[in-house]
Curated annotation (Swiss-Prot):
Enzyme class: isomerase
Active-site annotation: 33 (proton acceptor), 250 (proton acceptor)
Name used for this protein in its record: Alanine racemase
Cofactor(s) named in the record: pyridoxal 5'-phosphate
Entry keyword annotation includes Isomerase: yes
Enzyme Commission number(s) of this protein: 5.1.1.1
Source organism of this protein record: Neisseria gonorrhoeae (strain ATCC 700825 / FA 1090)
Entry annotated with the keyword Isomerase: yes
TM stretches of this protein: none
A single GO molecular function term of this UniProt record: pyridoxal phosphate binding
Gene that produces this protein: alr
């Protein structure tokens, strides 16, 4: 059997939730969209069932999957519905929809609901994706408030640069949000992972923990308060010694500078490892760091082995405990979200 494995450490997930909940205060949504950032939404949700105040997803299908698996917690649809007919499923499965534009608002208000719905009303405080502009927010809020079909309204927005403290953008967005919601009653939600960790003023009634929930610092590097949940590993299935000036891999982009011991490992870009990861990207053999050499192939890659490192059959960590996923992402010119969400053709093992 091909030895590409993903370990999901559910104990680390629970640890991270507790840390983030303590830091934020109030209530905390566990963001499990995109199959819990590649970790497995159902398994992660059940691991957090006795801790989480609620969950957040991106799509109706993601919410339905949690409900049909037995999750009874509040589930927020962060993007709301994509067509008016989806409000039927919102009601059937007791989901909390975000409303971030006029057609979503009108479709919700024109429907005859059997039971009142809790709405998350989004403001575009400066990211300019979805949400009502601050000068339009009060009228959208008033329309919902006047409806007999609306149970309550959570006011929320999303930060564009919370992981870039020096930008000043988060302060601008918070000011816009506070001015636009002045005098409007109800709960609020502003803090994503970066804000939970670093911006106390953004910690309102509800936090939304995504990346940090899975043990990854949104600021790059590592955060000693968090424990990585995902560990991606494989094994060496081939080994050889190459002479100096030997090319390796497609395009012959890497040449050995000396007699070099190399290992061939079972993971490639078809498994989700980024093809653009350059030579010198870190991996670890039995806990000792080494590097990728040559281009990433579809199904395999080549690593350098020193004289002290074991070879054939030994484990190679691609990211997890020894290899920080942020380091891999930075080397490949991408972000850890993309790496985790792209993993496939791997065996998943869940560790309680």
């Amino acid at each position: 059997m091909r030895p590409l494995n993903v370990q999901i450490r559910l104990g680390n997930l629970r640890h991270n939730y507790r840390i983030l909940k303590e830091m934020h205060g109030g209530k905390l949504l566990a963001v499990v969209k995109a199959d819990a950032y590649g970790h497995g939404a159902v398994r992660c949700a059940f691991a957090l069932a006795d801790l989480a105040d609620g969950f957040a997803v991106a799509t109706i299908d993601e919410g339905i999957r949690l409900r049909e698996s037995g999750i009874t917690h509040p589930i927020v649809l962060l993007e709301g519905v994509f067509e008016a007919s989806e409000y039927e499923a919102v009601e059937q499965y007791s989901l909390w929809p975000a409303v971030g534009n006029q057609w979503q608002l009108e479709a919700l208000l024109s429907r005859h609901w059997k039971k009142p719905v809790k709405v998350w009303l989004k403001m575009d405080s400066g990211m300019h994706r979805t949400g009502f502009f601050p000068h339009d927010y009060t009228s959208a809020y008033a329309a919902l408030k006047q409806s007999e079909y609306v149970d309550s309204i959570v006011k929320f927005s999303h930060f564009s640069c919370a992981d870039e403290p020096e930008s000043g953008m988060t302060e601008i967005q918070m000011e816009a949000f506070d001015l636009g919601t002045k005098g409007l009653e109800g709960e609020e939600s502003l803090a994503n992972s970066a804000a939970i960790l670093n911006i106390p003023e953004a910690r309102r009634d509800w936090g939304r923990a995504g990346l940090a929930l899975y043990g990854i610092s949104p600021f790059g590097g590592s955060d000693d308060r968090l424990k990585p949940v995902m560990r991606l590993s494989t094994r060496i299935f081939g080994e050889r010694v190459l002479q100096p000036h030997s090319p390796i891999g497609y395009g012959a982009t890497f040449y050995t500078s000396k007699s070099t011991r190399v290992g061939l490992i079972a993971c490639g870009y078809a498994d989700g490892y980024p093809r653009r990861a350059p030579s010198n990207s870190p991996v670890a053999v039995d806990g000792k760091l080494t590097r990728v050499i040559g281009r990433i192939s579809m199904d395999m890659m080549t690593i350098e082995l020193d004289a002290s490192q074991e070879g054939l059959g030994h484990e190679v960590e691609l990211w997890g405990d020894t290899v920080n996923i942020n380091t891999v992402a930075e080397a490949a010119g991408t972000i850890p979200y993309e790496l985790m969400c792209n993993i496939k053709r791997a065996k998943f093992t869940y560790i309680e």
